[in-house]
């Protein structure tokens, strides 16, 4: 496909299916009739893909968080102003994505503070445990005048966990299915190590 054209609003899925059918010998898909429209802006295209992805049962919390984060960046650039969580909620709803304000806040916190372990985050855990505890540590550091140092120490710990999980996933590629180790974030261990790092930072 020419670089100046891109599928829109679910087109990626349909295009992939058409390619597979053509590869199997179905000549009806040798050519496709398409409608060419003016580019509506990056923000609109991002939400169209998010709506498409919502139909997938396997879409992860992190994929949603990153998509909403990218949408926010593009929409703020287009509108030339920052958006509150409430405003972002309304913009997403207008485009068919019904994420609540608290969910959007969790997405934002994950992309800003939990990115090193992002691919292994679970929605419920972030909402009920991880975000409240990490927020408390960050707030404590800020109150004691060590906000930047505290955040850096917490990021070091999260990078260690993220690197270990990526290494395990890579090692699993060379193993039979029955031999593979689960690649899951141990939330309790992570939070314990984050708290220890915070204590050490504060002395």
Go through the PLM ranges and name each one.
Residues 20-24, 71-74, 110, 114:
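Conserved, well-folded catalytic cores of nucleic-acid-processing
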Residues 20, 90-94:
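Residues at alpha-helix termini
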Residues 85, 93-151:
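Amphipathic alpha-helical "recognition" segments
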Residues 18, 68, 194:
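Aromatic/hydrophobic pocket-lining residues that form π-stacking "cages" and hydrophobic walls in ligand
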Residues 1-5, 141-145, 149-203:
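Accessory, typically intrinsically disordered or conformationally flexible segments
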Residues 1-32:
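Short, charged/polar connector segments at secondary-structure boundaries
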Residues 25-90:
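Amphipathic, charge-rich alpha-helical segments that serve as recognition/docking helices
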Residues 12-13, 39, 107-109:
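An acidic- and aromatic-residue-enriched active-site/binding cleft used to recognize and process polar
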């Amino acid at each position: 496909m020419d670089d100046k054209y891109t599928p829109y609003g679910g087109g990626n899925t349909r295009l992939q299916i058409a390619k597979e059918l053509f590869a199997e010998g179905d000549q009806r898909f040798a050519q496709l009739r398409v409608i060419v429209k003016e580019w509506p802006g990056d923000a609109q295209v991002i939400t169209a893909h998010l709506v498409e992805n919502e139909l997938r049962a396997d879409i992860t919390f992190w994929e949603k968080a990153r998509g909403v984060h990218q949408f926010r960046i593009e929409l703020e650039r287009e509108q030339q102003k920052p958006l509150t969580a409430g405003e972002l909620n309304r913009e997403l709803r207008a485009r068919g994505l019904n994420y609540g304000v608290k969910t959007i806040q969790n997405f934002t916190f994950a992309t800003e503070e939990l990115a090193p372990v992002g691919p292994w985050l679970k929605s419920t855990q972030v909402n009920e445990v991880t975000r409240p505890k990490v927020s408390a540590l960050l707030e404590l550091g800020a109150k004691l005048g060590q906000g930047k140092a505290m955040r850096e120490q917490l990021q070091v710990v999260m990078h260690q966990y993220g690197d270990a999980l990526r290494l395990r996933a890579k090692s699993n590629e060379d193993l039979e299915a029955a031999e593979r180790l689960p690649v899951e974030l141990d939330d309790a261990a992570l939070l314990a190590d984050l708290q220890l790092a915070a204590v050490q930072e504060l002395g």
